Structure formats: structure tokens, C-alpha cells
Curated annotation (Swiss-Prot):
Cofactor: binding details: Binds 1 FMN per subunit.
Protein name per its UniProtKB record: FMN-dependent NADH:quinone oxidoreductase
Keyword vocabulary terms for this entry: Flavoprotein, FMN, NAD, Oxidoreductase
Swiss-Prot/TrEMBL catalytic activity: 2 a quinone + NADH + H(+) = 2 a 1,4-benzosemiquinone + NAD(+); N,N-dimethyl-1,4-phenylenediamine + anthranilate + 2 NAD(+) = 2-(4-dimethylaminophenyl)diazenylbenzoate + 2 NADH + 2 H(+)
Pfam families from the UniProt entry: Flavodoxin_2 (PF02525)
EC number from the UniProt entry: 1.6.5.-, 1.7.1.17
A molecular-function term among this protein's GO annotations: oxidoreductase activity, acting on NAD(P)H as acceptor
Keyword NAD (UniProt): yes
Binding site for FMN: 9, 15-17
Gene for this chain: azoR
Assembly information from the UniProt record: Homodimer.
Segment forming the signal sequence: none
Family indicated by similarity: Belongs to the azoreductase type 1 family.
Cofactor(s) required for function per UniProt: FMN
Length: 209
């Protein structure tokens, strides 16, 4: 299987969400020795924020783009191509101030493209085009808000991924990362246990084993 990993923490190797991704990748290395992994780090290699030039480039037909618009659109095209090429997509996302990092929001803006990753039917209903993917959302959260109104990020991500056609999505959160060393260790251990309990069979989708 081809696995795409999107990292988004600004903390590099000290990132808790990256630790979860590393734990998953170690498991995949054993269970899928023939698989391939592509890693994109949005903090180390940031995706530019949307501006007027970006919108202009993406909404201009490819054959009509000037040289600068072609350069701008090339990155978005690469990000989208990675999505379609992958069988499994792993997003490692920390919670910053109750929401996702700015660099991850910028990534979403680049991959949410009408006529490319989603379209509208004749009846005006949206249809996601990034289909048939296993998606694992690995979240690191300073507090403990899973399943409460304070967790504003998870509902948004569920809606956005479904809008793009990604419906086989499993969320695993390491909570309590900013509540002391013991709480952080317990939160990471529980999240790792949930990762270990996953069935990663491509034919069955992500599910608890």
C-alpha cells in the first residue's frame, strides 16, 4: 500500500502528534514491508497561505495560465496528486487554541478544489472525488476535550474530509499533553494502544481489531 503522511506541528521531533505518526509508521514497516511511505512536513516545508494570486492561478484554466500562475498552481497540483496516489492518508495534527494549525488550514485550502477534489452534481449537491482512501487522523491535544463542545476541530475536520470524499476516517487523539508529565505519558500510551488495535487491511478499511 501507498501511505501518505502529512505532519503539521511546529515542534518537529518534539511533537506529540509526530510521535503518534512515528508509532504508526513503525507498525506499518513490520506489517507492510512492501509498502511505500511519503511524508510531507507542513512546518518544515510550509504551504503558502492563500492570497489573490493563488486564487487567480487556480481559477484560471491550465491552458490560459501565464508563467507565474503555472508556478503557483504547480504546488497545489502536487498536493492533490499525492492524495489521489495514496491508498492510505495519515494526518498528524496538533490542536492550537481549540483549532487546527494555520499551516494545516492552508494545506486544506490548496487541496479543496472545485472540479478536482470535489464537484457539484446537476442537482447542486456536492460530491467528493477523493474516494476509496483509508484516513487516519492523529491528534495531539493539550487538554481533555474529546467529545465536548470545546472540541471544535474534530467536527470541522470530519465535515471537510467527507466533503472531499474521504469517509473511511478514524480519529485517535492523545489528550492531556499540557497537563503534566504523567498525564501526557498516559495520553500518549492510550493513543498508541488505539493505534495498535487498528485493523489496517486495505480491503476492510480502518476498524478496531
Amino acid at each position: 500500500m501507498k501511505t501518505l503522511v502529512i505532519l503539521s506541528s511546529i515542534l518537529g521531533d518534539r511533537s506529540n502528534s509526530k510521535q503518534l505518526a512515528d508509532h504508526l509508521l513503525a507498525r506499518l514497516k513490520q506489517s507492510e514491508p512492501g509498502g511505500t511511505v511519503k511524508i510531507r512536513d507542513l512546518a518544515a516545508d510550509p504551504v503558502p497561505y492563500f492570497d489573490g494570486a493563488t486564487v487567480g492561478a487556480l481559477f484560471t484554466p491550465a491552458e490560459a495560465r501565464n508563467a507565474e500562475q503555472q508556478r503557483i498552481a504547480a504546488l497545489s497540483d502536487d498536493l492533490v496528486a499525492e492524495l489521489f496516489d495514496a491508498d492510505r492518508i495519515v494526518f498528524a495534527v496538533p490542536v492550537y487554541n481549540f483549532n487546527l494549525p494555520a499551516q494545516f488550514k492552508s494545506y486544506i485550502d490548496h487541496i479543496a478544489r472545485a472540479g478536482v477534489t470535489f464537484r457539484y452534481t446537476a442537482e447542486g449537491k456536492p460530491e467528493g472525488l477523493v474516494q476509496g482512501k483509508q484516513v487516519l487522523m492523529l491528534i495531539a491535544r493539550g487538554g481533555k476535550s474529546e467529545g465536548t463542545p470545546d472540541d471544535t476541530m474534530t467536527p470541522y475536520l470530519k465535515q471537510m474530509l467527507a466533503f472531499l470524499g474521504m469517509t473511511d476516517v478514524t480519529f485517535i487523539a492523545a489528550e492531556g499533553m499540557a497537563m503534566g508529565e504523567l498525564a501526557a505519558q498516559e495520553g500518549l500510551a492510550l493513543a498508541r494502544q488505539r493505534i495498535d488495535a487498528l485493523s489496517l487491511d486495505a480491503r476492510q478499511g480502518l476498524a478496531a481489531a
